[in-house]
Amino acid sequence: MKIKFINHASVLINVNGVNLISDPWLFGSTFYDGWSLISKSCQVDWGEIDYVWISHEHPDHFHVPSIKSIPEKYKANITFLYQSTMDNKVNNWLKSQNFKVKLLPNLKKIKIASNVFIKSGKTPQDDSWLLIDDGKTKFLNLNDCETKSKQFKFIMKKFAREIGRVDILASQFGFASYLGYNQTIRKKSAQSVLDKVDYQIEVLKPKYYIPFASFSYFSHKENFLQNKENNSVFDVHDFLLKKRRTLPVVLYPGDTWIPYKSHNNNSALEKYKKDYNNAFQKPLNDNTKKYNLNFLKQKSLEYKEKIIKKNVFLK
């Protein structure tokens, strides 16, 4: 198994002749210009890609512009992997773009190559994780999955019993929500994410941890202030070294690592140091359209009615 870091929550896994990439957000901003990538993504050779796994619908994972940038000539050879959902929205959209889609059954092993199996599981808030197992190495992409709720703690412990020790864990290390102007709340939220990572490591006991799914920054005039308290890759790296439960493997876009081979984090950390500094010096996004409060209230009521009509459980 080879692991190549692309950016943010995107890694390219090469195993037994198969190439699987996750959550490609390769360029541009997202969340209405509220988030931007800290570093420039490395190039993806779509002609080599067999599978694209999408964890959930948030635009830093299901990034429509990046998916639309895939050349038409490669689409026939690429299969998207996604969780089965009631609305089929992502599935239908991908098919409309001429992609093949395979919906993954919850907690079921699927063979994708000789001696290579994947397993996907749903979690609260419509997220999902992916386990890749080649018989020698188990790589778990947990991305943004909620692991502190009672429901997921139960699932995760059961999951750990089923699969045994995970060799490599990749998960989110920074908060993503808008937390307002209360500095204390932001600090507590940042610490809670590190505590969540520590809990994941306690239960799953990975040999290695790859900092993941948090290589973006708040890039809009209205949310930039939140960067001050959020966790950086340096914070999670130091946190893990102090805890001594696992070995952090910090990868920079374009870095390739073979599990159980030695890896020096210093090169990646030095590059990220420059990128963080550069990102925070860039002009802030401020081209969001402004609307008056009454207009927004009316639109929210219309949206509420639309959701009720489309959701059988709310009728």
Regions found by a protein language model. Name each.
Residues A9-N14, K109-G164:
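Catalytic core of the metallo-beta-lactamase
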Residues V18-E57, V64-E72, T147-G164:
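Pre-active-site segment of Zn-dependent metallo-hydrolases
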Residues I21-D23, E48-F62, F80-S84, L140-E146, ...:
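Active-site neighborhood of phospho(di)ester-bond hydrolases with catalytic His/Asp-centered motifs
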Residues G28-S29, H58-F62, M86-V90, K108-K111, ...:
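Active-site environment of divalent metal-dependent phosphoester hydrolases
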Residues H63-E72, K89-W93, H220-L225:
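Metal-dependent catalytic neighborhoods of phosphoester/phosphodiester hydrolases
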Residues K75, F80-T137, H237-D238:
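Metallo-beta-lactamase
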Residues I78-L81, K150-K243:
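Cap/insert and terminal regions of metallo-dependent hydrolase folds
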Residues W257-K315:
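Feature captures hydrophobic
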